[in-house]
Amino acid sequence: MSNKQETKILGMPPFVVDFLMGGVSAAVSKTAAAPIERIKLLVQNQDEMIKAGRLDRRYNGIIDCFRRTTADEGLMALWRGNTANVIRYFPTQALNFAFRDKFKAMFGYKKDKDGYAKWMAGNLASGGAAGATSLLFVYSLDYARTRLANDAKSAKGGGARQFNGLIDVYRKTLASDGIAGLYRGFGPSVAGIVVYRGLYFGMYDSIKPVVLVGPLANNFLASFLLGWCVTTGAGIASYPLDTVRRRMMMTSGEAVKYKSSIDAFRQIIAKEGVKSLFKGAGANILRGVAGAGVLSIYDQLQILLFGKAFKGGSG
């Protein structure tokens, strides 16, 4: 716990500094990875797009998806949905970084006093709780980003899109499905966010003081690689939940919907096989570079601005 003399940093409370630093680094890294992000979403949700008549045939992998998307829509189309993603990701990641330390303080476990296992469990719990809390505020933006990214402009459809932008997604969804349409898939999202964010933050905070020591301490490359490994593992562990929630999102505005997340799991596995739950996972691993960048850039900003005196965020 910080004492009273350490409550102000650059004239701002640590909570505010944490919020701003986390959000800025997240927005920059997500914009850089936007093309990978969209390809991942297209491959992941292609079966729902085919059922809705918005895609004429399946993609034969990440390379084929990239080739067809740029041919049909142009290079800049790889950033479609990025505006919504930045708007969504700024508060999401910023709130994650900010609230995680609040939750961590609530658990109050110390590695030297309570042991490594309990300290690590506290990190996992605080990371998961922070992610689930922030999800309540930004879920509809995640929904809108998903619909925009999967709004393919296929040659067969004459180039017509379903949505004309972020506001149009909200307008059409509210008209067809009401508020429920904006929150379809929220259940598996909560489960997925706890698994992913819990590992994303918890494992990074727990492993970092063990691995990034000696010559590796404050090393950008080592911090980046550790962050990439953590995001990759967390992403694979939670990927089936991510697939189900996004497939449920894609049914808003459609005549046929999944009855529940369990029904979605059952139907996808029965009709497409278990491997369909992992479609786009390869692109998701590449996308992990963005998440790793968030953590490592955040740590470097702490070193430059606070000389590691401030221990918010991933510190």
Curated annotation (Swiss-Prot):
This is ADP/ATP translocase. The keyword Transport applies. GO terms for biological process: mitochondrial ADP transmembrane transport; mitochondrial ATP transmembrane transport. Residues 38-80, 146-184, 243-283 are mitochondrial matrix. A cardiolipin binds at residues 62, 81-83, 166, 184-185, 260-261, 280-282. It catalyses: ADP(in) + ATP(out) = ADP(out) + ATP(in). Its main location: mitochondrion. A motif (Nucleotide carrier signature motif) lies at residues 245-250. Belongs to the mitochondrial carrier (TC 2.A.29) family. Bongkrekate binds at residues 30, 88-89, 96, 196-197. Solcar repeats lie at residues 13-106, 118-210, 218-304.
